[in-house]
From Swiss-Prot:
<keyword id="KW-0808">Transferase</keyword>
<dbReference type="GO" id="GO:0047200">
    <property type="term" value="F:tetrahydrodipicolinate N-acetyltransferase activity"/>
</dbReference>
<keyword id="KW-0677">Repeat</keyword>
<dbReference type="InterPro" id="IPR019873">
    <property type="entry name" value="DapH"/>
</dbReference>
<dbReference type="InterPro" id="IPR011004">
    <property type="entry name" value="Trimer_LpxA-like_sf"/>
</dbReference>
<dbReference type="Pfam" id="PF08503">
    <property type="entry name" value="DapH_N"/>
</dbReference>
<dbReference type="InterPro" id="IPR013710">
    <property type="entry name" value="DapH_N"/>
</dbReference>
<comment type="function">
    <text>Catalyzes the transfer of an acetyl group from acetyl-CoA to tetrahydrodipicolinate.</text>
</comment>
<comment type="pathway">
    <text>Amino-acid biosynthesis; L-lysine biosynthesis via DAP pathway; LL-2,6-diaminopimelate from (S)-tetrahydrodipicolinate (acetylase route): step 1/3.</text>
</comment>
<keyword id="KW-0220">Diaminopimelate biosynthesis</keyword>
<keyword id="KW-0028">Amino-acid biosynthesis</keyword>
<dbReference type="Pfam" id="PF14602">
    <property type="entry name" value="Hexapep_2"/>
</dbReference>
<dbReference type="InterPro" id="IPR050179">
    <property type="entry name" value="Trans_hexapeptide_repeat"/>
</dbReference>
<dbReference type="Pfam" id="PF00132">
    <property type="entry name" value="Hexapep"/>
</dbReference>
<keyword id="KW-0457">Lysine biosynthesis</keyword>
<dbReference type="InterPro" id="IPR018357">
    <property type="entry name" value="Hexapep_transf_CS"/>
</dbReference>
<keyword id="KW-0012">Acyltransferase</keyword>
């Protein structure tokens, strides 16, 4: 799925100008303070239209006092509804961040496999048949090519780019660059394998067909079709048939 590609400066402006939100989910037994919060209609019932206009979502039976109810919205809008109620007695509250500027990506229409627990921020591009494993963290502006797997706990920083049919191993880090705006992001080519817990430093480009060994720290550009390893990473050999066999991807893992 193609997201709008943003430059570093555009991302900075997007975050800086975004309305900061502290989203909460309240589960309560009892009746919210609709009157005190100014959400009571003339007929004495909750004004659901006014609630919606404030970005507050309400679920449950609000005509029965002791039925279970759920309120979702920004803390500043929801807070007045809880006046007179006691936390952990009348209600419980779940907090999602504080003054967050970037929402999570809506993945409903993305033609990829995204496992529970992956954290993907808005303005991320994910190609068809890509795989995002649990615990992966993908920051704003990142791009993931078709058929690429981002393994468990891997981190793609802001604007990091990975080509097609690549594999970013568990715990690996592709360092992100949003500030300074002049810096270049990490770019990983097609058919690349980055081993577990490897780190690719800001601005580094990894050429197509190459392998970054587990635990390597890559501080310089990597040409195509080589294996790099060590701290800092150095070229240890060119890709040969044996290496290709060891690093081959499994198409079945990308079936949807």
């Amino acid at each position: 799925m193609e997201a709008q590609k943003l430059s570093a400066q555009e991302i900075i402006q997007f975050i800086g100008n975004a309305e900061k939100k502290t989203r909460v989910k309240v589960t309560l037994s009892g009746m919210p303070s609709f009157k005190a919060a100014g959400f009571l209609a003339e007929n004495g019932r909750p004004n659901f239209k006014a609630l919606a206009n404030k970005g507050i979502q309400v679920l449950g039976d609000f005509h029965t006092h002791y039925s279970l109810k759920i309120i979702i919205g920004d803390w500043q809008a929801v807070r007045p509804l809880l006046s007179g109620l006691t936390e952990n007695k009348d209600y419980t509250l779940e907090l999602e961040g504080r003054n967050s500027a970037v929402p999570l990506l809506d993945t409903r229409e993305i033609n990829a496999r995204i496992e529970p627990g992956a954290i993907i921020r808005d303005q991320v591009t994910i190609g068809d048949s890509a795989v995002i494993m649990m615990g992966a963290i993908i920051n704003i502006g990142a791009e993931i090519g078709e058929g690429t797997m981002i393994d468990m706990g891997a981190i793609l920083g802001g604007r990091a780019t990975v080509g097609k049919n690549s594999h970013i191993g568990a715990g690996a880090v592709l360092a992100g660059v949003i500030e300074p705006a002049s810096a270049e992001p990490v770019r990983v080519g097609d058919n690349v394998l980055v081993g577990a817990n490897a780190v690719v430093i800001e601005g580094v480009q990894v050429g197509s067909g190459s392998v970054v060994a587990a635990g390597a720290i890559v501080t310089q550009d990597v040409p195509e079709n080589v294996v790099v390893a060590g701290v800092p990473a150095r070229i240890i050999k060119e890709i040969d048939e044996k290496t290709q066999q060891k690093t081959a991807l499994e198409d079945a893992l990308r079936n949807l």
